[in-house]
């Protein structure tokens, strides 16, 4: 079969607190697999005002270093793979304006949506848990 996009735009780093390995390890694995484009998309930081610390995303202070690290690796591996840097974000109105300003200020390439929470992670349920039961199609298999 031909025509498959050899790309991955949903790659997290250690900064999101639930990924393992270094950016370099991810890049080298992608090259070995024949991936042409690799996008890093850590969970976007949220500017929590009350001191809340997320367990699934980097802090606002880590964002510039994250973008810088991926950009530097992009230069190093430019002859082998195209790297992109962005964020995976939920649409949470109270944070969106500040997140968008940070995204623009840092010169990110893209943002993907991953609506893990219906509201802020402080006030809303983790919605991914709503979809963990088998699908109706899976229940009919023996």
Language model features: what each stretch is:
Residues 1-93, 102-103:
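An N-terminally biased module of ancient metal coordination in phosphate/nucleic-acid-related enzymes
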Residues 24, 117, 138:
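Short, flexible micro-motifs
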Residues 46, 120, 139:
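Active-site loop signature of alpha/beta-hydrolase-fold enzymes
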Residues 50, 122-123, 142:
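Short glycine-/acidic-enriched loop or helix-start segments at secondary-structure transitions
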Residues 81, 110, 140-141:
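Secondary-structure boundary/capping signal
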Residues 90-133:
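Hydrophobic alpha-helical segments and helix pairs
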Residues 131-142:
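Single conserved hydrophobic/aromatic residue that forms the stacking wall/gate
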């Amino acid at each position: 079969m031909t025509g498959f996009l050899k790309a991955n735009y949903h790659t997290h780093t250690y900064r999101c607190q639930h990924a393992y390995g270094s950016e370099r390890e991810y890049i080298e694995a992608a090259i070995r697999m024949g991936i042409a484009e690799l996008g890093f998309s850590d969970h976007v930081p949220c500017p929590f005002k009350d001191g809340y610390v997320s367990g699934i995303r980097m802090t606002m202070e880590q964002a510039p270093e994250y973008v810088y690290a991926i950009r530097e690796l992009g230069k190093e591996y430019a002859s082998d793979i195209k790297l992109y840097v962005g964020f995976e974000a939920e649409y949470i109105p109270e944070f969106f304006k500040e997140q968008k300003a940070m995204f623009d200020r840092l010169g990110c390439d893209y943002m993907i949506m991953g609506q893990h929470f219906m509201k802020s992670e402080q006030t809303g349920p983790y919605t991914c848990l709503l979809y963990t039961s088998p699908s109706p199609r899976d229940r009919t298999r023996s």
